[in-house]
C-alpha cells in the first residue's frame, strides 16, 4: 500500500481520536491536564497495546514525533473551540471515528502480518489498534466502553484483521477497498442502529416479578378515625 496515502489516513485518525478524547474529558469537566491525557491516550493507546502484544518495542512511539505534535495541537484546538463549533463537530464525529477505526485497524493488522504472526494475532492487533485507545479513554472517564456496548464497532476491525491475516488483500487497491468497507459498514451501524445480540440479567418491569407481600399492620378505617376525632372534640 502507498505509504503516503496510508499516512493521510493515520493523520485523520489521529486528529479524530485526539479530539474525541478531549471532548469526553471536557464533558466530564476535567482540567486542561485531564483533557490532554485523555486526548493522547485515545490517539495512541491502541497502538501501544498492539506493540506490547505483537512484540514491537513500545519506544517506537517516540519516533512518531510529528503525530504526537499533531495530537497535541488537536487537543489544544478542541479545548479552545466555541461550544457551537463543538456541537457541530460531534454531529460528524462518527464519520471521523470510523475513518480512524479503519485506518488503525488495517495498520495494526499489517504490522502483525508482516512480522509473520498467526491470524489470531493479526486479528487481535487490528482490534486493539482500532479500539484500544477508546476503551482506555472511557475507563479513565468512568464510563462503560461504548465500543463494547454501542452499535457494532469492534466487529469491523476484527473483519479487517481476518481478511488481511488470511492473505486475501495483498494489493494497494485491495487494502483501500477494505478501508472503504470498514468505514461504510461502521456508518451503517450508526445510522441503522445495528447491534449485536445481548442479554440482560436484570429482569424487565413487565417480566415475572414476585408480588410484594401485603402489610400485616392493620390500617385504621374511616369510622375509627372519625370516632377518635369526635372524642378529641
Model-derived features: where do they sit?
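Helix-coil boundary and interhelical linker segments in multi-pass alpha-helical membrane proteins
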Residues: 1-5, 52-62, 107-121, 165-174
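Ordered, amphipathic secondary-structure segments that act as subunit-interaction surfaces
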Residues: 72-111
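Intrinsically disordered, low-complexity non-transmembrane regions of multi-pass membrane transporters
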Residues: 1, 194-233
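C-terminal ends of transmembrane helices
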Residues: 18-28, 51, 76-90, 135-145, ...
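Cytoplasmic-side transmembrane-helix entry/capping segments in multi-pass membrane proteins
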Residues: 33-41, 63-68, 89-100, 125, ...
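N-terminal topogenic module of multi-pass integral membrane proteins
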Residues: 1-44, 48-59
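Structural signature of hydrophobic alpha-helical transmembrane segments
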Residues: 2-14, 40, 59-73, 117-130
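Short, structured motif recognition centered on aromatic/hydrophobic residues
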Residues: 37-41, 48-54, 124, 128, ...
Amino acid at each position: 500500500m502507498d505509504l503516503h496515502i496510508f499516512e493521510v489516513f493515520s493523520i485523520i485518525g489521529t486528529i479524530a481520536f485526539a479530539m474525541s478524547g478531549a471532548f469526553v474529558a471536557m464533558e466530564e469537566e476535567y482540567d486542561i491536564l485531564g483533557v490532554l491525557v485523555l486526548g493522547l491516550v485515545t490517539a495512541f493507546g491502541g497502538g501501544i497495546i498492539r506493540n506490547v502484544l505483537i512484540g514491537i518495542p513500545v519506544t517506537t512511539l517516540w519516533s512518531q514525533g510529528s503525530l504526537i505534535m499533531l495530537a497535541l495541537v488537536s487537543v489544544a484546538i478542541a479545548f479552545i473551540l466555541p461550544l457551537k463549533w463543538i456541537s457541530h463537530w460531534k454531529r460528524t464525529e462518527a464519520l471521523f471515528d470510523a475513518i480512524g477505526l479503519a485506518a488503525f485497524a488495517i495498520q495494526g493488522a499489517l504490522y502483525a502480518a508482516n512480522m509473520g504472526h498467526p491470524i489470531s494475532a493479526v486479528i487481535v492487533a487490528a482490534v486493539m489498534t482500532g479500539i484500544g485507545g477508546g476503551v482506555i479513554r472511557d475507563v479513565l472517564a468512568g464510563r462503560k466502553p461504548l465500543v463494547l456496548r454501542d452499535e457494532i464497532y469492534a466487529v469491523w476491525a476484527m473483519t479487517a484483521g481476518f481478511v488481511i491475516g488470511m492473505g486475501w488483500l495483498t494489493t494497494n487497491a485491495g487494502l483501500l477497498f477494505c478501508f472503504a468497507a470498514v468505514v461504510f459498514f461502521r456508518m451503517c451501524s450508526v445510522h441503522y442502529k445495528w447491534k449485536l445480540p445481548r442479554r440482560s440479567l436484570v429482569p424487565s418491569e413487565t417480566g415475572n416479578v414476585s408480588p410484594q407481600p401485603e402489610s400485616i399492620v392493620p390500617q385504621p378505617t374511616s369510622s375509627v378515625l372519625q370516632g377518635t376525632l369526635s372524642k378529641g372534640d
